[in-house]
Amino acid sequence: MSEINFDPVNLTQSLVKCASVTPKDEGALTVVANHLNAIGCDCHPLTFSGNNSYEVKNLFATIGNEGKHFAYAGHTDVVPVGNESSWKYPPFSARIDAGKLYGRGSEDMKS
């Protein structure tokens, strides 16, 4: 496995900027795949039927073929924004103010 240096704040900002409101992906899985590919993962996009009414994009990634198996499940989608005027900053701006990152998903699986 390769080592890679990356900025976790930059990664979080990249993900928050993706307006991935369920069931839309809006590029979030591409951001994840690019980072996983950089450390040697093989990434495979998958599409499932969500409740037979919409498609749900997923990403299956593997690295190596020896040792014990480890599985990690996460998500990059967020619930709808609601009243955008209630937000201090636009919900997908990934704005940093006074050392805090603001945006949809910044305190969930996007961080």
Residue ranges and their predicted role:
Residues 109-111:
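Short, intrinsically disordered, charge-balanced linker/junction segments flanking boundaries
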Residues 2-107:
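Acidic/His- and Gly-rich active-site-bordering loop/insert found
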